[in-house]
């Protein structure tokens, strides 16, 4: 029996219905969440992601704006855009699309975000809360990985709360937006977690680590990095890679492939995710889920401030 292919699209569809219901509930209270993206330059993957989330925001009834800057923009220009979005009451969530050009400091830009609008938890405060197990927002891609894993486990008759404490989760890649948060989420579920990156590969030890995985999350950004020699029989493999490559058939088209050598890994895996159509659709919806949560929180804060001002005005008349 071959490996099962975990299609993320129906899982994303179920999640989207829940998010749409939340948007409707907020609309009944006069609240409309708003997502803003900041795109610097013309990176292929970033532009594709911006188009997807913009379309999804419109579909769900959220406000959406993309602030586009040329690759030559100065860091001060990006910080000015972030400051403008921080102050805009119509914007509840801000996503700075990566990669940023090399002359712009990611830490400086991320630190400038309003933590309440930082829906990818890249601000130091939000990253710290996530590491402590008390996240304000869970970043969309690692959240999507575990949401997909949880749904797959449930549907195959294994409660996640029983699976993880008995299992080893291996995360390949240590990026701030995927690898490191995925490690935190694995620990939060009680799993033994192994984190490895390019250093393990250069030292010739990557295979040693990945062969221990009951669940393998690969977010290295290297097309076809993991083949069947890197995985044990029965692994559940989640591919986060989105690598644009030229069509080997010579059509001139650009194709997206993952970090798994899909056909090879499928010979040994219990289940694995495709690229595209695996983690990606869930990631998109989760970003809007965080945007809606941010909108709800900001609306509650605004209401509390109004009540407080009313209380002060009343007391001044007594």
From Swiss-Prot:
It comes from the Bacteria. GO terms for molecular function: methenyltetrahydrofolate cyclohydrolase activity; methylenetetrahydrofolate dehydrogenase (NADP+) activity. It catalyses: (6R)-5,10-methylene-5,6,7,8-tetrahydrofolate + NADP(+) = (6R)-5,10-methenyltetrahydrofolate + NADPH; (6R)-5,10-methenyltetrahydrofolate + H2O = (6R)-10-formyltetrahydrofolate + H(+). Its EC number is 1.5.1.5, 3.5.4.9. NADP(+) binds at residues 173-175, 242. GO terms for cellular component: cytosol. Pathway: One-carbon metabolism; tetrahydrofolate interconversion. Keywords: Amino-acid biosynthesis, Histidine biosynthesis, Hydrolase, Methionine biosynthesis, Multifunctional enzyme, NADP, One-carbon metabolism, Oxidoreductase, Purine biosynthesis. InterPro entries: Aminoacid_DH-like_N_sf (IPR046346), NAD(P)-bd_dom_sf (IPR036291), THF_DH/CycHdrlase (IPR000672), THF_DH/CycHdrlase_cat_dom (IPR020630), THF_DH/CycHdrlase_NAD-bd_dom (IPR020631). GO terms for biological process: L-histidine biosynthetic process; methionine biosynthetic process; purine nucleotide biosynthetic process; tetrahydrofolate interconversion. The keyword NADP applies. Catalyzes the oxidation of 5,10-methylenetetrahydrofolate to 5,10-methenyltetrahydrofolate and then the hydrolysis of 5,10-methenyltetrahydrofolate to 10-formyltetrahydrofolate. Homodimer. Belongs to the tetrahydrofolate dehydrogenase/cyclohydrolase family. This is Bifunctional protein FolD 3. It comes from Rubrobacter xylanophilus (strain DSM 9941 / JCM 11954 / NBRC 16129 / PRD-1).
């Amino acid at each position: 029996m071959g490996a099962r292919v975990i299609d993320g699209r129906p899982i994303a569809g179920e999640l989207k219905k829940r998010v749409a219901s939340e948007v409707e509930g907020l609309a009944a209270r006069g609240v409309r969440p708003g997502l803003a993206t900041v795109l610097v330059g013309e990176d292929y993957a970033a532009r594709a992601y911006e188009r997807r989330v913009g379309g999804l925001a419109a579909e769900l009834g959220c406000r959406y704006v993309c602030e586009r800057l040329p690759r030559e923009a100065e860091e001060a220009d990006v910080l000015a855009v972030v400051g403008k979005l921080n102050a805009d009451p119509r914007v509840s969530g801000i996503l700075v699309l990566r990669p940023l050009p090399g002359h712009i400091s990611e830490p400086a830009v991320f630190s400038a975000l309003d933590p309440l609008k930082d829906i990818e938890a890249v601000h130091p405060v939000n990253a710290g809360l996530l590491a402590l197990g008390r996240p304000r927002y869970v970043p969309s891609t690692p959240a999507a990985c575990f949401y997909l894993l949880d749904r797959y486990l449930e549907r195959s008759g294994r409660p996640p709360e029983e699976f993880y404490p008995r299992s080893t989760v291996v995360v390949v890649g240590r990026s701030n937006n995927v690898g490191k948060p995925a490690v935190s989420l694995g620990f939060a579920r009680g799993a033994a977690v192994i984190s490895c990156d390019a250093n393990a590969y250069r030292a010739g030890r990557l295979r040693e680590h990945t062969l221990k995985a009951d669940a393998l999350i690969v977010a290295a950004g290297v097309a076809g990095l993991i083949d069947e020699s890197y995985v044990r029989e029965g692994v559940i493999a989640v591919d986060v890679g989105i690598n644009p490559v030229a069509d080997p058939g010579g059509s001139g088209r650009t194709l997206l492939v993952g970090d798994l050598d899909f056909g090879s890994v499928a010979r040994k895996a219990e289940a694995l995710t495709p690229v595209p159509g695996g983690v990606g659709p869930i990631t998109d919806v989760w970003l809007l889920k965080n945007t809606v949560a941010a909108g709800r929180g900001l609306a509650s804060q605004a209401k509390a401030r109004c009540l407080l001002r009313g209380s002060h005005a009343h007391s001044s008349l007594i």
